[in-house]
């Protein structure tokens, strides 16, 4: 049985118990504590999760996809909050989170990609978003390392970046300074009493009581034992492999902004950090819980990145990682109360977890203090997914620790 080895079996109480200590769980806990709520977080390794793999693009405009326009308003609202959010978090934690207002350049490498990018530009304009169409020559003038074959691109000055690892570390520190209590253990099962969520039982046997419970366990959110079937979040893991390279001083500046493209139908992006790190990603694989870094995944990312920026083959490869994105059926998050009183969800953010961190924290804090979601978050309430019929004999799940 997995446990931290330092918990007791006595019941401990709080106003809010957050299950999951990734960036979504941490921002929820931080905001709740700022509102005066006694808050606790359960996670064996708080600050970990998908943020340790993510690139940190804040791409409300360039992440717009057909069929996902519902998500646009939430993405734009969160992106607009990022400058103030970053400043507040850095002041609260004393740590730099690597927020850079550097912009993004999305480019096309052939005529088909160019036509697709033109369609995306038209969709952005119809949606009231700011983006500028550039010729291939104009793209290379902005980023000289781009391949000569670039046929055109979209310049989006409002899509920025943040370092997710620094973001997670800063949120952890801010939570600790705000008085959030951490239980570094696995949750064995949800606690339910008198028809409402009442806390959790940890792997070490500790019973945690809480007036409200927030399930923010990322891709594991649907695996928590004790969840009634009608409130199990429809969240699945989507594997993503990511590479990190280092730009030696002799090659700097390699890129000045995030560069992204679609190569042979696969999305690839290159995110330059101020410290010389270059993040290349990401695969999108329906592989269940597998987090193996594969030769094929590394090859595909380097091959596509090389077509975009040929000079990348000269850079040292310093890290290969794979993580799991928590995806919902419509690729949008689940935010808000469930059919089980006292249980709320903050999960299913898929590829937008870093971008949606500010608005998620604000929305969950408002829910926890007033009982109501703000208008911007209401379209993402869990009730939009009707639960599947279940036999009466299997009304409570028996699953793995979350």
Predicted regions and their residues:
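Extreme N-terminal leader/targeting segments of oxidoreductases
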Residues: 1-15, 34
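Dinucleotide-binding Rossmann-like beta1-alpha1 core, especially the glycine-rich loop
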Residues: 57-138, 142, 305
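N-terminal Rossmann-like FAD-binding beta1-loop-alpha1 element of flavoenzymes
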Residues: 14-40
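Active-site substrate-recognition segment that forms the wall
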Residues: 30-34, 42-44, 56-57, 95-98, ...
């Amino acid at each position: 049985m997995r446990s931290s080895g330092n918990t007791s079996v006595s019941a401990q109480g709080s106003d809010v118990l957050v299950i999951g200590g990734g960036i979504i769980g941490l921002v929820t806990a931080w905001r709740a504590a700022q509102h005066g709520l006694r808050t606790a977080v359960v996670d064996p390794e708080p600050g970990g999760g998908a943020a340790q793999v993510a690139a940190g693009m804040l791409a409300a405009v360039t992440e717009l996809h057909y069929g996902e326009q519902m998500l646009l308003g939430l993405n734009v609202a969160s992106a607009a909050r990022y400058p103030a959010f970053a400043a507040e978090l850095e002041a609260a934690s004393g740590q730099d989170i690597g927020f850079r207002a550097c912009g993004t350049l999305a480019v096309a490498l052939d005529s088909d990609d160019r036509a697709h990018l033109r369609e995306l530009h038209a969709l952005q304009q119809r949606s009231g978003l700011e983006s500028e169409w550039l010729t291939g020559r104009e793209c290379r003038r902005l980023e000289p390392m781009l391949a000569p074959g670039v046929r055109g691109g979209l310049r989006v000055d409002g899509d920025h970046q943040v370092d997710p690892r620094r973001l997670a570390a800063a949120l952890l520190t801010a939570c600790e300074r705000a008085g959030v209590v951490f239980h570094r253990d696995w949750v064995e099962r949800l606690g339910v009493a008198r028809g409402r969520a009442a806390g959790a039982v940890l792997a070490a046997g500790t019973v945690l009581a809480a007036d409200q419970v927030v399930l923010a366990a990322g891709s594991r959110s649907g695996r928590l034992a004790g969840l009634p079937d009608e409130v199990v979040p429809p969240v699945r893991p989507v594997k993503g492999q990511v590479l990190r390279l280092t730009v030696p001083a002799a090659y700097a500046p390699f890129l000045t902004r995030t560069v992204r493209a679609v190569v042979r139908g696969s999305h690839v992006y290159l995110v330059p950090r101020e410290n010389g790190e270059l993040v290349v990603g990401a695969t999108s694989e329906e592989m269940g819980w597998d987090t193996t870094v594969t030769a094929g995944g590394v090859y595909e990312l380097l091959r596509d990145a090389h077509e975009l920026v040929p000079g990348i083959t000269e850079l040292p490869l310093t890290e290969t990682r794979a993580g799991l994105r928590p995806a919902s059926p419509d690729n949008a998050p689940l935010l808000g109360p469930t059919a089980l009183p006292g249980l709320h969800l903050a999960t299913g953010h898929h590829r937008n977890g870093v971008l949606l961190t500010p608005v998620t924290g604000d929305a969950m804090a408002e829910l926890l203090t007033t009982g109501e979601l703000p208008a911007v978050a209401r379209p993402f309430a869990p009730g939009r997914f009707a639960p599947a019929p279940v036999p009466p004999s299997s009304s409570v799940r028996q699953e793995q620790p979350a």
